[in-house]
Amino acid sequence: MSRGLGDVYKRQYPIGTIFVINTKAGRFPKEVEQMEKVKVSHIERREFDHGATRDMGMQMSKAEIVVFMTQDAVPADEYVIGNLVKVLEEDEMTGAAYARQLAASDCNYIEKYTRKFNYPENSRIKSKEDLQEMGIKTFFCSNVCAAYKRNIYEKAGGFCKKTIFNEDMILAGHMINAGYKVAYVAEARVIHSHNYTGMQQFHRNFDMAVSQAEHPEVFEGIKSESEGIKLVKQTAAHLVKRRKIHLVPKLVYQSGCKYIGYRMGKMYKKLPDKVVKWCSICLLYTSPSPRDMRRSR
């Protein structure tokens, strides 16, 4: 976290205040609380919610443009924030802009290719007109590093106050369906990647599908699985071309975990409570299960 915040200071765009919302777990670095323009709020882990906690940060700020970053994202250069803001300022209908994610040096080979697939070199501004061509990827947005215009954020309803996952795509979907645009800014770059196991991929994709099932107003009728199939085919071809055939079984295994998790998440309402809780990554941070969250609404 200290490294990421330190790099945020090395920017070409003036920053007002940096709000840090920390879940109480272990020692919090004092040097962060002592940084200039940094305000730290501590919450209990059980209070954390992907949507509500980020909305809390939005309400803390009074800025017209608010940038969200996760603690494990590191700016690749000093231009990341300026590049995001520039796109928002150039078009009054663009409500969100998210950064390109580059693989870290310790990232495994398959994940490096996945980063390039999901975060290509060319920028793109997405609108409702792109749904036919891009399908669900039209709504893709990542709060690992993303900027939002406050006025459009509020008109689109803001982040869901109760969501298991995927708060960024849900909001992006609401924006696009309301006639606004979402920008992918390849010039705004952060270093961020994970070496997830197959089971971790299963849990993440289960929760992703649950979030989509919970928001039919955004995702119903939107083609989604074709993009995953395209990724698998292109990755396999890349591995063969690069003579990394020994990695193909790993790709097949991880892709299978993703697909099974996704399919089970789509039908989670039909599954027993114990199965739902086992499938959800919520157990990793002791949040309510997807079914509990649905009942609390």
What are these regions (language model features)?
Residues 10-43:
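Acidic donor-binding segment of Leloir-type glycosyltransferases
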Residues 79-111:
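Conserved donor NDP-sugar-binding/catalytic core segment of glycosyltransferases
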Residues 182, 188-261:
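Active-site-adjacent helix/loop segment of glycosyltransferases
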